A protein has these predicted regions:
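Carbohydrate-active enzyme catalytic cores, enriched for enzymes
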Residues: 232-246
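Acidic/polar, glycine-enriched structural segments that form the non-catalytic walls/loops
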Residues: 1-92
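Accessory structured domains or lobes within enzymes
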Residues: 58-62, 66-68, 197-200, 216, ...
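Aromatic-rich carbohydrate-recognition surfaces in CAZymes
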Residues: 14-37, 89-198, 214-232
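C-terminal ends of transmembrane alpha-helices
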Residues: 72-79, 193-201
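Short linear capping/connector segments at secondary-structure termini
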Residues: 202-209
């Protein structure tokens, strides 16, 4: 098993059905080596070409480093309901997934969903019980709930809403948001009440301690509210769209 997930032992994704041995994996790797490596080289060339056009040689080299560092930091699994899960060893925090998300939004938005799925589950199962997302869900190898301590209500609610809206934009539909609409609405309501003046809250720079009336945090909250309004608009929820966009 790779991780304990709210009482369920998860297998690594390559052996999610429990029927694949490491010897089978080695055999498949040998058989598919040439085909897989050709795809890898083609992807590398495309990534470098896109990054070079966007910002030149140095930017492209930074993108290559960032891609490898980000992808190697995650591991993938699947729960008993077939829900894809994408974890870092700290299992969150959302404010670390947020800056990584543009990479996955471009190449595979399903992996951004897989980052958010555990947070939606934790909120919707009743295990969390707060009107904003948890900061984290535990640490490897146990995903049992927030352990780091110190909620980041505006930070994480804003991140969750913005990431969900970004998924909808990339997929050109809001079906993922619709699936979690009740939870997203709860987060948006929290931001509407607390997002413009954030009081005395932690931000992603939590080493600095609480930051009263933090301007950047307010901006995150406002963008989260706007993200919810855009999702409501995509789902033809006109009243909600007008309320949160105004």
């Amino acid at each position: 098993y790779t991780m304990a997930y709210f009482g369920e032992d998860l297998r690594p994704y390559w052996n999610k059905d429990g029927k694949t041995s490491i010897e089978d994996l080695y055999a498949d790797a040998e058989e598919d080596y040439k085909e897989v490596m050709a795809k890898c080289y083609a992807f590398d060339r495309q990534l470098m070409a896109d990054a070079y056009l966007a910002g030149g040689k140095e930017y492209a080299e930074l993108c290559a480093l960032a891609y490898r560092q980000s992808v190697s930091a995650f591991q993938m699994s699947e729960d008993s309901e077939g829900e894809l899960l994408y974890f870092t060893p700290q299992v969150g925090p959302v404010d670390e997934y947020y800056p990584a998300s543009p990479l996955y939004l471009r190449y595979n938005p399903d992996l951004v969903k897989a980052m958010l799925n555990p947070f939606f589950y934790y909120s919707e199962s009743g295990k969390w019980g707060k009107p904003f997302p948890p900061h984290d869900l535990g640490g490897y190898p146990a995903v049992n709930g927030q352990t780091i301590g110190g909620d980041m209500p505006v930070e994480e609610a804003g991140n969750g809403l913005i990431m969900t809206a970004a998924i909808a934009k990339m997929e050109k539909n809001a079906s993922y948001a619709e699936k979690h609409w009740k939870t997203l609405t709860q987060w948006a309501e929290y931001l509407l009440e607390n997002g413009t003046d954030t009081g005395d809250q932690l931000t992603t720079d939590n080493f600095a301690g609480n930051c009263p009336h933090h301007t950047n945090l307010s901006a995150k909250g406002i963008l989260g509210i706007a993200a919810y309004a855009r999702l409501a608009e995509m789902l033809n929820k006109k009243e909600e769209a007008e309320k949160y966009m105004d």
